[in-house]
């Protein structure tokens, strides 16, 4: 009997180490950033069983077998649609400014489609203004409305949007609503989904969370886009979820969320429409390719129109696209670079690009909220302050609420606005969308918004930061090790 237990003990030990060795080899064989690999190995060696379970469920990009197959089968029809769209030569920009040229070339090469011109663009900085404008557009919709959001939180003006959407469906407008399962959990537990479906709205719960599927698909892979499309002509995107800040996370102690949205009219709605159709088909298996731009309603020839490129990221889209775009934008800066983000946990490459820009004389400013809703990200973000400050980067901590805007302005000409945070999830994991605008007029509008943020912020003093408490440095470094996983 003693021999039996001895043999079993040795077999368990051997199996235990074999499992660790197998997972270690899998991590090393996967093509990933070195800091990310090291962070996973550290977790597995410190907390072996917990680390292995965490890695198998969260460490690799699993879209799920069914969704991955849909993504594969949809591509031929999507590619044909893109080729057909290229015949509409008059909607594509042939020239870009010097600062935007490299980024637009990158996007066209990687995504197969150039930036589109002739768009009207409005920057919305107030949630009330955004929701009231959206309600008005929904009330005037004639054919179709497509929406995707990470969070839809019932209450306040969000209910006005829901009522307008149901009214549109009742009068015959085809309404589709795609919401992330985790982000919109409160919505899906409310009466609103049933009410909307009864009114004729096609409501879909994206990337449904289930413990039974934890090893089949990454549970932290989320649908993070915020997009509204109306009649293949009007489009919205930006940082704002479908929430009324007065009713959203009031107990978090961070104040009301401050967001930025862009409302567009023009052919960019068509290019955003193909992104939505991909998301819809991956989730439902149903194909809804958008129609080509209507020459009778598109303001192609207006000299005041904006040139816009749309960048989509996430599983099924060009790998590492948004990360490459951000690096290109930063390296294109010659005079000024202003960035706003709620979560500052950049990759090593992006961190070095920002610091290098400051070293070569670019005036670099980063605006982040002083208080955020994640303790882990707050401490991890602080770990990057020292290197940024040493390079001469100005860091502003916004004190007027939780600054949730995601924007970049390069030399007053090149603007990036969308859903992407400067963290690992946005850069390499989630479904995201970013607008790239080559226009100094829009750049001036964005600069005014960023200047308002700075006016409501406190500049981090480099000397005082260097003398912060030692225990704070220890906590920052601890979370820094895990920053590739945040």
Curated annotation (Swiss-Prot):
Keywords: Cell inner membrane, Cell membrane, Lipid biosynthesis, Lipid metabolism, Membrane, Phospholipid biosynthesis, Phospholipid metabolism, Repeat, Transferase, Transmembrane, Transmembrane helix. InterPro entries: Cardiolipin_synthase, CL_synthase_A, CLS_N, PLD-like_dom, PLipase_D/transphosphatidylase. The keyword Metal-binding does not apply. Pfam families: PLDc_2 (PF13091), PLDc_N (PF13396). GO terms for biological process: cardiolipin biosynthetic process. Its EC number is 2.7.8.-. The chain crosses the membrane at residues 3-23, 38-58. Catalyzes the reversible phosphatidyl group transfer from one phosphatidylglycerol molecule to another to form cardiolipin (CL) (diphosphatidylglycerol) and glycerol. Belongs to the phospholipase D family. Cardiolipin synthase subfamily. ClsA sub-subfamily. This is Cardiolipin synthase A. The gene is clsA.
């Amino acid at each position: 009997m003693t021999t039996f237990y001895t043999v079993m003990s040795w077999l368990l030990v051997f199996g235990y180490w074999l499992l660790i060795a197998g997972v270690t080899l899998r991590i090393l064989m996967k093509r990933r950033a070195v800091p990310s690999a090291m962070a996973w190995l550290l977790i597995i060696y410190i907390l072996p069983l917990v680390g292995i379970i965490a890695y198998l469920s969260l460490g690799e990009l699993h879209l799920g077998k069914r969704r991955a197959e849909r993504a594969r089968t949809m591509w031929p029809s999507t590619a044909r649609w893109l080729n057909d769209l290229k015949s509409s030569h008059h909607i594509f920009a042939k020239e870009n400014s010097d600062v935007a040229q490299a980024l637009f070339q990158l996007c066209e090469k990687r995504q197969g489609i150039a930036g589109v011109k002739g768009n009207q663009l409005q920057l919305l900085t107030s949630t009330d203004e955004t929701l009231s404008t959206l309600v008005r557009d929904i009330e005037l919709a004639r054919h179709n409305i497509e929406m995707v959001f990470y969070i839809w939180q019932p209450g306040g003006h969000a209910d006005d949007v829901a009522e307008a959407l149901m009214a549109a469906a009742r009068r015959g407008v085809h309404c589709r609503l795609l919401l992330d399962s985790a982000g919109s959990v409160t919505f899906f537990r409310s009466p609103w989904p049933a009410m909307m479906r009864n009114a004729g709205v096609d409501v879909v719960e994206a990337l449904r969370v289930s413990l039974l599927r934890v090893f089949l698909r990454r549970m932290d892979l989320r649908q993070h886009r915020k997009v509204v499309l109306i009649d293949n002509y009007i489009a919205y995107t930006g940082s704002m979820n479908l929430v009324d800040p007065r009713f959203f996370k009031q107990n978090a102690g961070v104040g009301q969320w401050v967001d930025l949205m862009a409302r567009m009219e023009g052919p960019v709605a068509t290019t955003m429409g193909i992104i939505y159709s991909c998301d819809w088909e991956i989730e439902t298996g149903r194909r809804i390719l958008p129609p080509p731009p209507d020459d009778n309603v598109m303001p192609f020839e207006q000299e005041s129109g904006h040139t816009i490129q749309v960048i989509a990221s996430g599983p099924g889209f060009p790998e590492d696209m948004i990360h490459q775009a951000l690096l290109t934008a930063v390296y294109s800066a010659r005079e000024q670079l202003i960035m706003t983000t709620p979560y500052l946990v950049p990759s090593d490459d992006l961190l070095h690009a920002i610091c290098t820009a400051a070293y070569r004389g670019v005036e670099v400013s980063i605006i982040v909220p002083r208080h955020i809703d994640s303790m882990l990200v707050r401490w991890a973000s602080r770990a990057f302050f020292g290197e940024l400050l040493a390079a001469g980067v100005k860091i502003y901590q916004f004190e007027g609420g939780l600054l949730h805007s995601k924007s970049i302005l390069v030399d007053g000409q090149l603007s990036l606005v969308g859903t992407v945070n400067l963290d690992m999830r946005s850069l390499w994991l989630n479904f995201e969308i970013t607008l790239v605008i080559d226009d100094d007029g829009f750049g001036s509008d964005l600069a005014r918004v960023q200047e308002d943020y700075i006016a409501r912020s406190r500049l981090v003093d480099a000397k005082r930061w260097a003398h912060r408490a030692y225990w704070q440095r220890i906590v920052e470094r601890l979370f820094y090790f895990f920053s590739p996983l945040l």
